[in-house]
């Protein structure tokens, strides 16, 4: 009996900062981050190369800062620093779990994390290390979703896995409409026409133009990441 092989060799996992909060109102929930790392470890054991882009919304959101009178660029830089904090926590948890993680930042903080250098990131992935990309794109006015699309394209990821609190993309908000159904797959064009809000427009356009598929799934469902990587019917595939 042949062992099933993963559907993807190299993935870019986009984690929101909020996902790290668990049931807390702020910060990083220890049990939640350990569980996420366990799910990622399970995938690396299949031989899949994993890169992660992490948000910072559990600590600070640039958009929120801009809305209360703060200069938007300054607020965005603060948001980038929040992602560095999350990346350090994620990397530390991975290393304690027996994985080898490398945090690479788009803004220079060389005493804390190494700078993002594409050839080095590719080398780490080929060596089986998990690469965590911090500080978004390094530029204000760009979301961490856009960073996920950008880094995914740069490293030649086969798919961007957008981990959310919902198990896919629905015809309507499942919390408000009991008749809402989950799309198993949907094209970029249809998703844009229906304004489904899967990612911000910049990130979405970049994935579409690079023909980089997006898989939306729930990080809260145990084993969902592995099922996605194995190509099973989990979440929603957005394709070109």
Swiss-Prot record:
GO terms for cellular component: cytosol. Inhibited by UTP. Keywords: ATP-binding, Cytoplasm, Kinase, Nucleotide-binding, Pyrimidine biosynthesis, Transferase. UMP binds at residues 56, 76, 137-144. InterPro entries: AceGlu_kinase-like_sf, Asp/Glu/Uridylate_kinase, Uridylate_kinase, Uridylate_kinase_bac. Gene3D superfamilies: Acetylglutamate kinase-like (3.40.1160.10). Pathway: Pyrimidine metabolism; CTP biosynthesis via de novo pathway; UDP from UMP (UMPK route): step 1/1. Catalyzes the reversible phosphorylation of UMP to UDP. This is Uridylate kinase. It comes from Albidiferax ferrireducens (strain ATCC BAA-621 / DSM 15236 / T118).
């Amino acid at each position: 009996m042949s062992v099933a092989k993963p559907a993807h060799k190299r993935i870019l996992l986009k984690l929101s900062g909020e996902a790290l909060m668990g049931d807390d109102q702020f910060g990083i929930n220890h049990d939640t981050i350990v569980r996420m790392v366990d799910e990622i470890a399970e995938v690396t054991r299949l031989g899949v190369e994993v890169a992660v882009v992490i948000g910072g919304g559990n600590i600070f959101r640039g958009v929120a800062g801009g809305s209360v009178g703060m200069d938007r660029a300054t607020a965005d830089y603060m948001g980038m620093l929040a992602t560095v904090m999350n990346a350090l926590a994620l990397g530390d948890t991975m290393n304690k779990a027996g994985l080898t993680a490398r945090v690479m930042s788009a803004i220079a903080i060389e005493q804390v994390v190494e700078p993002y250098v594409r050839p080095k990131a590719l080398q780490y992935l080929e060596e089986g290390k998990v690469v965590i990309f911090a500080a978004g794109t390094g530029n204000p006015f760009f979301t961490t979703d856009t960073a996920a699309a950008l880094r995914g394209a740069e490293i030649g990821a086969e798919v961007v896995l957008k981990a959310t609190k919902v198990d896919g993309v629905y015809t309507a908000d499942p919390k408000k409409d009991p008749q809402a159904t989950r799309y198993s797959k949907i094209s970029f064009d249809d998703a844009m026409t229906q304004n489904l809000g899967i990612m911000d427009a910049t990130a979405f356009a970049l994935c579409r133009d690079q023909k980089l598929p997006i898989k939306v799934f729930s990080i809260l469902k145990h084993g969902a990441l592995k099922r996605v990587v194995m190509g099973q019917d989990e979440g929603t595939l957005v394709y070109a």
